[in-house]
Amino acid sequence: MTRHANRLSLVIAALGMAALGAGPAPANQDAPAPKPHYLSQPLVTSVYTADPSAHVFGGRIYVYASHDTEEGPPLADVEPFKNSEGGAFKMRDYVVLSMANPQAPVQVHRNVLDIADVPWAARQMWAPDAAYRNGTYYLYFPAKDRAGAFRIGVATSKQPAGPFRARPEPIKGSFSIDPAVFVDDDGKSYMYFGGLSGGQLQKNIGGVYDPNGPGGDPRAKDEQAFMPQVAKLRGDILEFAEKPREALIVDEKGKPLLSGDGDRRFFEASWMHKYRGKYYFSYSTGGSHFIVYAVGSSPYGPFTYKGKILLPVDGWTTHHSIVEHKGRWWLFYADTQLSGKTWLRNVKATELFYNRDGTIRTIDPFVTRK
């Protein structure tokens, strides 16, 4: 059994225990002494955070993060990573981490946005993203409505760390999870989104939610994989300017990746950045636990698969963002170093490097593997 499988077995076994609560991360305490097998240490230990979306506003880095709760998954979710609802992940609000640089002290901003202040949302505020335009900061977030369907909402603030005020309705035509907003050099903005299984992409064929749709990927291994969605945003970046379409990910021969290609096909966690005029679309492969990337010449794709950015971390989920700050590139990601529980994560950062040909050097989150 692999190192990752051993850890996953331990996590699943722990879920069957009666005492499912987790002790809180120690408040106002410095990060623990570095352990030799971790490449990076948690940015903060006073709060559990995940799904980091990093941006540079006014020269400072702001990381928009999910806020993991300490309730633990219900006993019905003994395998919460495989069921169709993602019941172990019950996040109700967001946290922002800000810093002068990834190696500087981190300020934790709370009271960013709470589900109680989102009129249309019922539960599960998952991975967010943010953008800036004309003096206003925009927070994009998925949540389930009262029908149990994931929609994507938007909230605004005059300050990068909020508090944000949500609009009364989700973005028209939005569905699934993991919004990632990319502003191109010409000022046009695009949203990438989607996630399989608990993210409901497979329940939204043609953008229409089917509550009785499959809980997981229904496609045969030799069928085209589900693809991420992309849509240009209106000038005010509050709504879609067009109907979402597939952002096609292809292999080196130009053929769409297949559903059975677990090490390369899209699962969730879209991110877009630009490097030397090319569009780098990165994402999580889900069950194989990689962060990988594909490159294209248009924000719509197609994107040709290139390789792995991040090898598997502690915990089941893997989610990331990539940002440039003062001439250096950084990867933000999360693992479960602090808690050892997949639903209680901590955000980390490490420097990212390109090769001369524009490919990205693969990062191992462990200095030495167990």
Where are these regions (language model features)?
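Signal peptide processing junction and immediate N-terminal pro/mature segment
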Residues: 21-29
